[in-house]
């Protein structure tokens, strides 16, 4: 299964809008094989909360103007650390670097193909997805967390908090 032409078009608009506002490490992934509710993820990094908000506003404005669509749902805008825009066929994740590294959507969806977007250079996915070989895990949904000997056995996004942070 591959993403629809409409989803690829909308994802491209979102990715270019994010690039216009200096979003970094912009990834567009075809998640049709893993997500029944969306065709593409657009994952973007912003340096700080203000930049995240600016990127989100630009994505919304460009998709409204060029595709006539508005998000069905918008989550996280108040905090500005990880904003999710759900457009149905695409879901945009605009995150601060710390959230992106910790939650690791790039790792969780490592097996999903990248969708090329003209004018947007996507990051080397290995740098975001290192440490997890999904092909060795098989179906990630079949992993039994109760069988793990330690947290390192689980396909989590990043290191857990230090003892003094708990």
Question: Could you describe each region identified by the protein language model?
Answer:
Residues 1-7:
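N-terminal presequence-like segments and adjacent domain-start helices
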Residues 8-40, 47:
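N-terminal first-folded block
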Residues 25-36, 70-89:
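Glycine/charge-rich, flexible interdomain linkers and switch-proximal surface loops
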Residues 43-46, 95:
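Short hydrophobic/aromatic beta-strand micro-patches
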Residues 51-69, 84:
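Compact, glycine-rich, soluble single-domain proteins
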Residues 95-108, 115:
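C-terminal structural segments of small proteins and small subunits
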Residues 113-146:
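Intrinsically disordered, low-complexity mixed-charge segments
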Residues 148, 157-163:
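Short linear motifs in low-complexity or flexible loops
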